[in-house]
């Protein structure tokens, strides 16, 4: 009986999710399929996916600082960002459910049964603006209450580089877990390396497992922290012109033993960094052969006319990421479909 109830609930949720499909979803599916016919790494991003991409690259957003998830028909608080408006209010707890959202001067909107991304879109907004949430506390028989929060710019620290120190025998080993090559990564790593130096670690491990890449510029600058100077990657455009991206500052921020952890989900910028460390003999690469993405994509908003003038008065059209270049290792090899082999 319990299994039947579980399956019935899941099927109902799947049917409801399909019924909530809108024209933007259909257009996005069609455009994505078209883009993938051009090459495997060319993508169309819907307006919401474009916003998500920008958030991941900048590690910041404007909102209330809460991670939400669906719980049957309810939008539930899964976690809160420390120091964010939701956490600071102390009026919201993990497990509470959001049943209504209201903007300043507008009526409360009932969001029970709504898609999660639609609820999120209502809650997010410019910093300094206010949003009213109708909260149904966790548990049975609870009564709703209204909580007013002022939106702020939130830095997503959980997606930034994380530092830890492990003790192995008598040695201290520093570990830097890098989930993505976001803008500002290299500066963050510099700070963490200084902390590790103060703790007298004997070696450093850089964990790039499940790191799908990010900004090419960050891959180059991060590599420069561990080599004196020299080329990091070669980039060839569609005209056959080759550009060399190099580290030129002559400064090494960490000179000790270095290990880079990779797996089959380490891709793009992760592969550039791992390949450079391998080609310079600077680090031991440990793990699985990487994904094998050796191309560079350019990001462009579809709200720009002729790629120049931004037209904010147009409805949001999303963006495209299209392949413009192919990159090569310092030794001249390509990672496309080959990856980096430990």
Residue ranges and their predicted role:
Residues 293, 314, 321, 336-342:
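Pro/Ser/Thr/Gly-rich intrinsically disordered low-complexity regions
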Residues 95-97, 333:
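Structural motif
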Residues 310, 314-327:
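Short acidic, Pro/Gly- and aromatic-enriched capping/linker segments at domain boundaries
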Residues 1-9, 328-342:
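Conserved functional hotspot residues or short segments at active or partner-binding sites
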Residues 62-64, 129, 318-320:
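Short beta-strand or tight-loop elements
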Residues 1-63, 67-72:
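Extended, domain-scale alpha-helical bundle/helix-rich regions
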Residues 19-22, 45-61, 70-88, 94, ...:
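Cleft-lining beta-strand/loop regions that shape enzyme active-site pockets
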Residues 141-146, 317-319, 334:
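Short, mixed charged/polar active-site loops
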């Amino acid at each position: 009986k319990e299994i039947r109830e579980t399956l019935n609930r899941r099927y109902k949720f799947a049917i409801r999710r399909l019924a909530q499909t809108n024209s933007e979803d259909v257009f996005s599916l069609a455009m994505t399929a078209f883009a993938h016919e051009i090459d495997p790494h060319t993508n169309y991003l819907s307006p919401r996916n474009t916003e998500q991409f920008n958030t991941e690259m900048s590690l910041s957003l404007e909102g209330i600082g809460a991670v939400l998830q669906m719980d049957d028909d309810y939008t539930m608080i899964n976690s809160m960002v420390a120091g964010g408006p939701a956490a600071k209010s102390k009026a919201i707890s993990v497990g509470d459910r959001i049943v209504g959202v209201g903007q300043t001067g507008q009526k409360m909107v009932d969001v029970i049964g709504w898609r999660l991304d639609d609820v999120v879109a209502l809650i997010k907004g410019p910093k300094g603006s206010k949003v009213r949430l109708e909260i149904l506390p966790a548990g049975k028989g609870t009564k709703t209450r209204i909580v007013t929060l002022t939106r702020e710019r939130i830095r997503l620290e959980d997606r930034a580089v994380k530092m830890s120190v492990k003790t192995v025998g008598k040695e201290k080993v520093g570990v830097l877990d890098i989930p993505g090559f976001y803008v500002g990564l290299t500066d963050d790593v510099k700070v963490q390396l200084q902390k590790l130096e103060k703790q007298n670690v004997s070696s450093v491990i850089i964990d790039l497992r499940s790191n799908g890449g990010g900004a090419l510029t960050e891959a180059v600058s991060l590599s420069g922290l561990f080599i004196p100077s020299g080329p990091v990657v070669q980039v060839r455009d569609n005209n056959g012109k080759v550009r060399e991206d190099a580290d030129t500052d002559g400064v090494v921020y960490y000179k000790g033993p270095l290990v880079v952890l990779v797996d089959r989900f380490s891709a793009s910028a992760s592969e550039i960094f791992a390949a450079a460390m391998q080609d310079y003999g600077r680090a031991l690469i440990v793990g699985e052969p990487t994904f094998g993405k050796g191309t560079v994509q350019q990001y462009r908003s579809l709200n720009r006319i002729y790629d120049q003038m931004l037209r904010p008065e147009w409805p949001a059209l999303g963006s495209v990421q299209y392949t413009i270049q192919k990159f090569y290792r310092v030794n001249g090899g390509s990672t496309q479909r080959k990856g980096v082999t430990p």
